[in-house]
Amino acid sequence: MNGIDKETYIGIVKFTLESMVDLAKSDKNYNLAADTIHYYETTIKPEMQISQDEFLELCKEVGIK
């Protein structure tokens, strides 16, 4: 996600996490923990736009513990 500011990037990440939480509520077979880890490892970490601590804080904000 090159070329976007950090605030916009955080908004996108938060929206994605909220969507994952919504999916977990509606689909009992959806593995929220595994998908959250996958999202971090394949998207957040390589893009290096936010730190792991910032990602974990966003997770807490949307209800992922």
Which positions does each model-derived feature cover?
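N-terminal acidic leader/helix
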Residues: 2-28
